[in-house]
């Protein structure tokens, strides 16, 4: 499920209405940040407002809050700039190596995302979107194929 949380965060597929941390602090997501493909936190340069204070830094995502400890982040200074810990399950309060608490957000997985995952996993079609093709108008299809046609010329 962690990879699904990454996807939801990266593409902002969550409801931003009345978001609250696990400590019931009002939070507003300004920028989800840049996805990190190397070691260290999952996203860099994120910006959030928590209880009226703007925070800028990194975001780490785990299925369970306790994964923070299991992965050794609690003693790793690379994670001291984490401003938000996104989890599916809040089973532990987490801290940086200097013992300051890290705000946590339980990111709910939207029903539509779960439905799409279920559909993709249970569909045997080699073209996952074939049923939706008739709904796309011809002009859109021409526009989509234009870069390919330009490359052929």
Where are these regions (language model features)?
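Compact, glycine/acidic-enriched structural inserts
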Residues: 80-82, 86-139
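Single conserved hydrophobic/aromatic residue that forms the stacking wall/gate
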Residues: 142-153
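Intrinsically disordered, low-complexity acidic/polar segments
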Residues: 55, 68, 93-95, 114, ...
């Amino acid at each position: 499920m962690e990879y699904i949380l990454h996807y939801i965060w990266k593409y902002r597929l969550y409801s931003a209405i009345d978001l609250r941390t696990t400590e019931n602090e009002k939070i507003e997501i300004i920028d989800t940040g840049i996805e990190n493909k190397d070691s260290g936190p999952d996203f860099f340069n994120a910006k959030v407002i928590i209880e009226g204070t703007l925070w800028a830094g990194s975001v780490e995502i785990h299925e369970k809050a306790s994964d923070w400890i299991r992965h050794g982040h609690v003693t790793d200074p690379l994670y001291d700039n984490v401003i938000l810990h996104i989890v599916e399950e809040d089973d532990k309060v987490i801290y940086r190596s200097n013992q300051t608490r890290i705000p946590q957000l339980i990111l709910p997985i939207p029903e539509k995302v779960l439905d799409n995952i279920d559909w993709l996993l249970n569909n045997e079609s080699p073209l996952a979107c074939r049923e939706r093709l008739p709904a796309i108008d011809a002009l859109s299809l021409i526009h989509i194929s234009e870069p390919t046609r330009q490359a052929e010329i």
